[in-house]
UniProtKB/Swiss-Prot annotation:
<feature type="transmembrane region" description="Helical">
    <location>
        <begin position="3"/>
        <end position="23"/>
    </location>
</feature>
<keyword id="KW-0472">Membrane</keyword>
<keyword id="KW-0812">Transmembrane</keyword>
<keyword id="KW-0602">Photosynthesis</keyword>
<keyword id="KW-0934">Plastid</keyword>
<keyword id="KW-0150">Chloroplast</keyword>
<dbReference type="GO" id="GO:0009539">
    <property type="term" value="C:photosystem II reaction center"/>
</dbReference>
<protein>
    <recommendedName>
        <fullName>Photosystem II reaction center protein T</fullName>
    </recommendedName>
</protein>
<comment type="subunit">
    <text>PSII is composed of 1 copy each of membrane proteins PsbA, PsbB, PsbC, PsbD, PsbE, PsbF, PsbH, PsbI, PsbJ, PsbK, PsbL, PsbM, PsbT, PsbY, PsbZ, Psb30/Ycf12, at least 3 peripheral proteins of the oxygen-evolving complex and a large number of cofactors. It forms dimeric complexes.</text>
</comment>
<comment type="similarity">
    <text>Belongs to the PsbT family.</text>
</comment>
<comment type="function">
    <text>Found at the monomer-monomer interface of the photosystem II (PS II) dimer, plays a role in assembly and dimerization of PSII. PSII is a light-driven water plastoquinone oxidoreductase, using light energy to abstract electrons from H(2)O, generating a proton gradient subsequently used for ATP formation.</text>
</comment>
<dbReference type="InterPro" id="IPR037268">
    <property type="entry name" value="PSII_PsbT_sf"/>
</dbReference>
<dbReference type="InterPro" id="IPR001743">
    <property type="entry name" value="PSII_PsbT"/>
</dbReference>
<keyword id="KW-0604">Photosystem II</keyword>
<keyword id="KW-1133">Transmembrane helix</keyword>
<dbReference type="Pfam" id="PF01405">
    <property type="entry name" value="PsbT"/>
</dbReference>
<dbReference type="GO" id="GO:0009535">
    <property type="term" value="C:chloroplast thylakoid membrane"/>
</dbReference>
């Protein structure tokens, strides 16, 4: 059951970092990667 907690923590951390970068500089790049 610990693996589940660690996975959740990892995903949460990645999500927070992603959000921070995303909001720090708004997506001005034209369709990149999609």
């Amino acid at each position: 059951m610990e693996a589940l907690v660690y996975t959740f923590l990892l995903v949460a951390t990645l999500g927070i970092i992603f959000f921070a970068i995303f909001f720090r500089e708004p997506p001005k790049v034209p369709n990149r990667g999609k």
